[in-house]
Amino acid sequence: MKFDSIDTTISTLGPLKITSPIRRGENGALDRNFVHDTDRVLLDVELNNLLKMVEEGKDFSAFELAGPRSKIYFDPSKLRCALVTCGGLCPGLNDIIRAIVLELFFGYGMRNIYGFKYGLQGFIPKYRHDILDLKPKTVANLHEMGGSILGSSRGPQPIDEIVDSLERMNIGILFMVGGDGTLMAATKIANTITKRGLKVSVVGIPKTIDNDIYMVSRSIGFDTAGDVATQAIKSAHNESAGFPNGIGLI
């Protein structure tokens, strides 16, 4: 696979002027454990390919390293965030929701975190779905539950209406948890936001039991789904093997 033609640039909404409220280390030093925008993770780790790129004078294709920055764009005390889970359910969805809410609340001091119910339908007024006000007490034991507290839905929704909803509610960051279809929708939403000149960040979080998302080596939910399916297959095999002409149905 050739990586040199892949654009991994992440656009920014503007200058980063606000000091991150995240406290790192016992002395609260702001430069400790923060990630710089120039930190990178290589896409291709094969030595021969890297040497060839050096010979050809090409830059290494790499992703920005994930992690907290010392300076941020939004003021967390005034920021409003939205979460949505789309597509098929898979193991780990509630864990994702819980982790995001707890980090935003305790790490960044945010108090306006909203969960849109039933996938992209939650943004469309005609469906009249409720919006959840997500707090730490709401997600305290969420990791012990299967499925998604926000529910889900399949199929496309009008992108313009989704962006209209984000604009009406003054949402600054949208977290979209889903598979390849959801991430394609996230791209369309981000493009529409850019065309309108809005200051909204779209964050795509890959999840799928199919593990078929491009550039993602292992997606959330894949291992658990594989383990559970294996147990079911083994049980059916053992049962059917114990009888003449036995057949196991999964």
Give the ranges of each region predicted by the language model.
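N-terminal low-complexity/intrinsically disordered extensions
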Residues: 1-79, 106-109, 141-142
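Short Gly/Thr/Asp-enriched flexible loops that form oxyanion-binding sites at enzyme active sites
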Residues: 96-100, 181-197
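Short glycine-rich or small-residue beta-strand-to-loop segments that form or flank ligand, phosphate
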Residues: 80-90, 148-151, 172-178, 204, ...
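Short internal beta-strands
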Residues: 110-119, 204
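Short, acidic/small-residue loops that bind anionic groups at enzyme active sites
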Residues: 190-219, 223-230
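Solvent-exposed alpha-helices and their adjacent loops that cap or buttress functional pockets
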Residues: 72-77, 82, 106-108, 140-144, ...
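Polyanion-binding loop/helix "lid" in catalytic or ligand-binding cores
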Residues: 230-250
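Glycine-rich oxoanion-binding loops at beta->alpha junctions
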Residues: 37-74, 122-172, 183, 220-227, ...
